[in-house]
Amino acid sequence: MIGRVDVKAWGKVVVLMGGYSAEREISLKSGTAVLQSLLRQGIEAHGIDVDKGVLTQLSKGQFTRAFIALHGRGGEDGVIQGVLETLNLPYTGSGVLGSALTMDKLRSKRLWRGMDLPTADFSVLTRDTNPALIAADLGLPLIVKPAREGSSLGMMKVESIEALQSAYREAVIFDTAVFAERWLPGAEYTAAILADRVLPLIRLETPRVFYDFEAKYHANTTRYFCPCGLSEKQEQDLQALALEAFQALGASGWGRVDLRCDEKAHPYLLEINTVPGMTDHSLVPMAAQAAGIEFDEMVLQILASSLERRMFQDGT
């Protein structure tokens, strides 16, 4: 389908990147990679480092569609999607609702649990929480997470009751909503989704405590396995679970679902990223390559979701 679309059909594309979230550095790298790909393929594309003047820039830019490469708050939480909806400017990825729900790990877990989809036991933390009760309920070790932050920022594994309060104080720097989750000691997998197709799974291994910001973007010690080492049936089951979880939260277009197994190799859903990284360390390009999809083709497939949104808006 992509090969039959004339370059002019894409119109004038704006790549939105940067922004003000804690993931700004990664977003700039992702956006630059996407912008270079579009230009390389002869598409008229322009990059915008999103700030308070973005509304004016978008209004005056005469753009025909937007490629969202913003990570974290402002980019994956429905905010920029709402702006683009208001401007009637088609954009890539999930809509307002799907973006807002998937950005919030707590609400994601509650919805999954309501649909009988597996996610690890958890408990909301506040400054008045009794650490001993949390430890008794979830067991130790556990992991503390900000509800609405990406790239594992603010997350900490907790081995003792005493460490729980300090982990909470660290997490609350990133978000007022914080929760503790049962630690899953098994293998970690990620499922990239492209146009409702789940790409080959990637198994992640890191010598660090978990797959944190350093392991994701800077460390050379992180190992990626694709094929992931599961049997064909096991991989298909995980892919089906990932797609069901993705669609259950209203996500669409493209994204990434992260899963981790317990000590018995039972899989649990961790979170969904609706604007995954597109850097040289990123997982979606890696999975796409394993599926025989080169980076430039993948960028066009993602951009194609904006064409579908345009058709929907036009009622054609």
UniProtKB/Swiss-Prot annotation:
Subcellular location as annotated:
Cytoplasm
Q: Which residues bind ATP?
A: 135-190
Binding-site residues for Mg(2+) 2, renumbered to this chain: E271, N273
**InterPro entries attached here?**
ATP-grasp, ATP_grasp_subdomain_1, D-Ala_lig_Van_CS, D_ala_D_ala, Dala_Dala_lig_C, Dala_Dala_lig_N, PreATP-grasp_dom_sf
Give cofactor(s), names only. Mg(2+); Mn(2+)
EC assignment? 6.3.2.4
Q: What does this protein do?
A: Cell wall formation.
Q: What is this protein called?
A: D-alanine--D-alanine ligase
Q: Report which gene this protein is encoded by.
A: ddl
